[in-house]
């Protein structure tokens, strides 16, 4: 979750770019289908194996890997897609905004962890 958030911090326009490419550009859609989605499916498969082991041990609550992955991605992406709106009510600039983004990253991690905790 943190690595994904950091990737988006370094490339804040990436989520909207990918979204626009999928919606409006057949070539862009095909590139996403061939490059991003296989990696996404692999990540879900690996996550699912780990989750199933922990669910069997009773250390985490049952959850589908796809749902957990979509939740984590959604939490992270929203901060960047809605950034113009967020800046209206956060009213933090420069270092304060950087601190806000760090808090947001940690909050996203905590939300996902709380979904797993028994």
Regions found by a protein language model. Give the residues of each.
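Short secondary-structure transition hinges
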Residues: 6-46, 67, 94-99
């Amino acid at each position: 979750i943190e690595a994904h958030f950091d990737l988006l911090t370094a490339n804040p326009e990436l989520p909207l770019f990918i979204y626009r490419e999928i919606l409006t550009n057949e070539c862009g859609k095909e590139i996403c289908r061939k490059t991003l989605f296989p990696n996404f499916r692999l990540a879900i498969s690996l996550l699912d194996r780990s989750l199933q082991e922990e669910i069997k041990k009773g250390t985490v609550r049952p959850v589908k890997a796809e749902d957990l992955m979509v939740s984590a991605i959604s939490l992270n992406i929203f901060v960047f897609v809605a950034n113009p709106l967020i800046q209206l009510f956060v009213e933090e600039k420069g270092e304060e905004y950087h601190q806000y983004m760090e808090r947001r990253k940690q909050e996203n991690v905590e939300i996902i962890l709380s979904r797993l905790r028994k």
